[in-house]
Amino acid sequence: MAPKKKPNKGGKEMQGKKIGGKKDASGTKTPELAMVEELKEFYHKQIQDLEDRLARYQRKWDELAVREKLFHQEFEQLANNKKEIVAFLKRTLNQKVDEITDLNDQLQSLEVAKDMEKDAFEAQLAQVRHEFQEIKDQLTTENIALGIKLSSLEEFRLQKEELTEKYLALEEQLHRQEGEYKEYVYNLEKKSVLDKDRLRKEIIQRVNLVATEFRKMATNQMWETTRRAILENNSVTLQLNKVSKHGVQLLQENEQLKGTQNKLCQQLEMLENTQEIMARKNIGHKKIILMLTEKCRQQRKGTEETEQLRLLLSQLEQNFQNVQRDNQTLRSEKDQLEAQLKEKQAEANRLQEELTKEQKIRANLKTVLIQATSMLQDIVHMQTEAEDGDFDVVFQLQRKELLQQLLVLLSSGVVLKTQPDMGSHQDKQPQGLSKESQRITQTSKEGAVSLLQQLSTITTYKPGDLGLVPRRPVRIPLKPQDLRPLSYITRMGICQNTNEIYPSGALKRFRKFTLPRPFLHRK
């Protein structure tokens, strides 16, 4: 603004001088020549003003050229940066490709390991396939759990879809904002153009008005009009300067907006390129994620199968331990049974020995019984002969003697029977028999002893008795508890003896007496 004001001040001074000079020369020169010279000076000043303005505009042009060079350098720097960014992105892309190849190699190695493990698991599965039917219910429960997991994965998919929808909405918002920005830039440019046109029209109108007023007032008030014209010219120049400044500012703003627009366009292109690259990478990553999820699912299935196999093996180990425990218990039971078997065999041997002894005793008793029957038959024959004849003392003596012999014979048989029983019971008692067997042996002993005592009380004669008069028979009471421990042969012999001693009316029965076959052949 300083160089603009200086020419105006110089113009005012020259105008003052010109007015003074004109006043001095007014008397010498004509008014027409003075007007021509003033017009020349006026136009000369205008030319100087315009030259000054041209110089200023040239300086501004130089400054704009320098700025353009700077902008060009910045543009080249941005291009270099773009190239470096592209190279960096290419390097990162190559690194990612290398990482992907490494991941593929790892995936292949994992697949090989998985195939090996799968073969091993299939072999194990073939070994225990027939046992998996028992855990069908467990597998159904696991399928239910997997269904729950699948529902959770479905929820994850829905969340992913929501995120993709949000991403699309953000993209739409970005496009909308870009459109709004373009409209805003277009409106600014339109406004600047309209402002320029309006200012141009206003300037033209003002110049026309000034020219018309100058023509009107030139004839009447030349000096005032010139002064006013100069003042208006100054004001117009000031307004033009303001307008030019405003235009320069608008141009600068326009250039800045264009630069920002170019930058934004470049950024938009870069973002679109990066978006495309990221979309491709995202697609590749999605494929990799799907592959990895599939592999992870397969690995989880493999781990679940291994867990199932481990559980099955643990169950089998528990079953094996239970079987071992059962086997140990069975072995202990077997040992106990073997010990019991040995005891039973020993007892069977002992019983066999007792049986042989009993058979021997039975044979002896049979002989004794046969002898007793023969003696009883002799007694019966003798008694029948005595009934036919008279009473004979000799017969009575013979009968008593035979009865004594029979009593001795029976008592010897009873002693032979009771002695082995007592010996056998004495042998059995240290071996720890039952209380019932001990009670039976004790009662048998007591019965045999009581029977012997009763038989021993029978005497053949008394002091002072010659046997001429028959004595009153002594009845031996037969008690069941006394006869129960005795054998069948002994009991039959006692019954025969009692019937022989007391022949009340059963002599005919004794005459027809014979041993039954089961008794003779009994073992």
Curated annotation (Swiss-Prot):
Induction: Expression is activated by FOXJ1. Its main location: cytoplasm. The keyword Kinase does not apply. The modification Phosphothreonine is found at residue 30. Residues 1-31, 419-440 are annotated as: Disordered. GO terms for molecular function: microtubule binding. The keyword Coiled coil applies. Residues 32-191, 248-274, 302-371 form a coiled coil. One of its GO terms (biological process) is sperm axoneme assembly. Residues 10-26 have a biased composition (Basic and acidic residues). Residues 429-440 have a biased composition (Polar residues). Keywords: Cell projection, Cilium, Coiled coil, Cytoplasm, Cytoskeleton, Differentiation, Phosphoprotein, Spermatogenesis. Disruption phenotype: Mice were born at expected Mendelian ratios and appear normal but homozygous males are infertile. Spermatozoa display impaired motility due to defects in the axoneme. Sperm cells show an axonemal loop of the midpiece, supernumerary axonemes and a disrupted axonemal arrangement, as well as defective axonemes along the flagella. Specifically expressed in tissues containing motile cilia. It comes from the Eukaryota. It is found in: Cytoplasm, Cytoskeleton, Cilium basal body. One of its GO terms (cellular component) is ciliary basal body. Specifically required during spermatogenesis for flagellum morphogenesis and sperm motility. May be required to suppress the formation of supernumerary axonemes and ensure a correct ultrastructure. Interacts with TUBB and TUBA4A. Interacts with CEP350. Belongs to the CFAP157 family. This is Cilia- and flagella-associated protein 157. The gene is Cfap157.
